[in-house]
Amino acid sequence: SSAASDVYKRQIQKRLVKAFPNIETEKDAEQEEKFAEGCGFFKLASLFIIGAFIGDIVETIFCLITTGRLMSRSSLVFGQFSIVWGIACALLTWILYRYRDKSNWFIFLFGTILGGAYEYICSVFTEIAFGTVFWDYSKIPFNLGGRINLLYCFFWGFAAVIWMKAVYPFLSRQIERLPKKAGRIICSLLLVVLTADMALSFAALARYGERQEGKEGNGVIAEKLDEYFPDQFIEKRYENLKIAK
């Protein structure tokens, strides 16, 4: 019977541990060497980095197909990374991880609401922080202040289902295959580089907004930002950028 089989297996395991006491220690050590297990900091950080890169590439290809033009979709002044997509991947995973076994309809509805709220907040933040608008859905039906629209909210819902049911499980397995020490070093270094890039991009965009208001730069930092990130550079890097009215 099944019960007798389980008892028999436990007896064998106890005898093996007694005969070879290092078995359990080696098993625990092997488990400890697993990088970014579960849904902790390093898993979310890895998903942020991967999501930022893949999101930028996908959006670039999408724009090329729909507009016939190759334009930059990066959030940063250096590198091809979309911070909006990176944060979305990490945030979506963190919130929906506990519901990953729920039905597709549940994930879709949750993702639709969550994605719409996230995009709206991002739009408000960029307008307040930089005085700029990166997207405007005013010409699309069922929009809310041009910041979000119903169709794109549904896209967020579909993306949530695909992400939680297919993409996330695959990426999670690949991430966990990295050696623990090497994985933490690589992930930490990439986070430091991206953080520095984000800080520089934030400063460059803020200074761009000041220039549009006719404000003179004061200090060495403002002078360097004007020199290395002039209007021509910013407007080419962020082609959809508009000054908020």
What positions do the PLM features span?
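Membrane-interface segments at or immediately adjacent to transmembrane helices
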Residues: 206-245
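Functional transmembrane or membrane-interface alpha-helices that line membrane-embedded catalytic
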Residues: 45, 67-105, 112, 126-165, ...
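Cytosolic-side transmembrane helix boundary signature
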Residues: 158-187
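Interfacial segments of alpha-helical transmembrane regions
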Residues: 43-49, 101-117, 182-189
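Cytosolic juxtamembrane amphipathic/interface segments immediately preceding
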Residues: 26-40
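Internal/C-terminal transmembrane anchor helices
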Residues: 180-204
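Transmembrane alpha-helix/helix-exit interface in multi-pass inner-membrane proteins
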Residues: 56, 60-63, 116-129
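Short, small-residue-biased leader/transition segments that mark boundaries at the very start
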Residues: 2-8
